[in-house]
Amino acid sequence: DVLGVTVEGKDLALYEVEGEIYATDDLCTHGAARMSDGYLEGREIECPLHQGRFDVCTGRALCAPVTENIKTYAVKIENLRVMIDLS
């Protein structure tokens, strides 16, 4: 599952992969597309605009046309709340 959220003015995409939550910037590094509108398969998110893919756990760009990694954020669950480190 993928969910777009805004935290302290920053647009993020949250992903559930094998019971863990991961977070990246919501904007693709290649084009103006929201990753939260993309297709998640395993730990890879496919950009809905040009079909480039990223590893949501590491942010690594996996295939053309994306060449720049996407920023990831540390996530932890506390008292059933998702806590994201924006630093």
Curated annotation (Swiss-Prot):
Binds 1 [2Fe-2S] cluster per subunit. Coiled coil: none annotated. The keyword Phosphoprotein does not apply. Its cofactor is [2Fe-2S] cluster. [2Fe-2S] cluster binds at C28, H30, C47, H50. Keywords: 2Fe-2S, Aromatic hydrocarbons catabolism, Electron transport, Iron, Iron-sulfur, Metal-binding, Plasmid, Transport. Component of the naphthalene dioxygenase (NDO) multicomponent enzyme system which catalyzes the incorporation of both atoms of molecular oxygen into naphthalene to form cis-(1R,2S)-dihydroxy-1,2-dihydronaphthalene. Functions as an intermediate electron transfer protein via a specific interaction with iron sulfur protein components (ISP) (NdoB and NdoC). Pfam families: Rieske. Residues 1-84 form the Rieske domain. The naphthalene dioxygenase (NDO) multicomponent enzyme system is composed of an electron transfer component and a dioxygenase component (iron sulfur protein (ISP)). The electron transfer component is composed of a ferredoxin reductase (NdoR) and a ferredoxin (NdoA), and the dioxygenase component is formed of a heterohexamer (trimer of heterodimers) of three large alpha subunits (NdoB) and three small beta subunits (NdoC). GO terms for molecular function: 2 iron, 2 sulfur cluster binding; metal ion binding. It comes from Pseudomonas fluorescens. It comes from the Bacteria. GO terms for biological process: catabolic process. PANTHER family: FERREDOXIN-RELATED, RIESKE DOMAIN-CONTAINING PROTEIN. This is Naphthalene 1,2-dioxygenase system, ferredoxin component. InterPro entries: Rieske_2Fe-2S, Rieske_2Fe-2S_sf. Pathway: Aromatic compound metabolism; naphthalene degradation. Belongs to the bacterial ring-hydroxylating dioxygenase ferredoxin component family.
